[in-house]
């Protein structure tokens, strides 16, 4: 099974068939897809200027999509290194019980679904790297009341999401499943109440 970097080389290789280059970009999403596979693909296609079903996209657009994905991946991998170092130090200092951020991080190790978008057509407009920087920044500060990706104030509690956790606060503006550790208890309660008002 090819790794992310090997697949990225195939996307860039002009000697490869265009279908293989597109396929390799899709396979990269099996290794790293911050919004989930389908939503990340839709995001990359719209930002690079080709359709999700386009079987013959301009090779330069494929490479542009890959570059955005690679930048986001490097942001996330740097965060994971810092996270691992912090946990190692905490364990050395006797803190064996992980906190809520650590529980959330366990579910997103490797970067899959870090900013899960249940509807593949609804996702942030900004670059993947920028969204991840905002998310990481939110994880490293005190909890707030808005979406860390877009500063959206309208969060609604959704059930039966195609992700773990399968319930949680979803931003109605950018569509991400907002990590619970970045929200105050009041913001979480408001999101739940919003769900009750919507379903009533």
Q: For the regions a protein language model found, what residue spans apply to each?
A:
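Short, charged early-sequence alpha-helical segments and their helix-coil boundaries
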Residues: 37-63
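Charged, low-complexity interaction regions
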Residues: 12-20, 35-37, 52-56, 114-122
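Short metal-binding segments enriched for Cys and/or His
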Residues: 175-191
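Short, non-ligating residues that shape and space the ligands of small metal-coordination modules
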Residues: 153-157, 180-181
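Short linker/helix segments within small regulatory modules
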Residues: 158-168
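Short terminal alpha-helical segments
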Residues: 1-32, 128-132
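Short cysteine-rich clusters marking metal-coordination/redox-active sites
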Residues: 147-150, 171-174
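Residues immediately within or flanking Cys/His clusters that coordinate Zn2+
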Residues: 141-144, 168
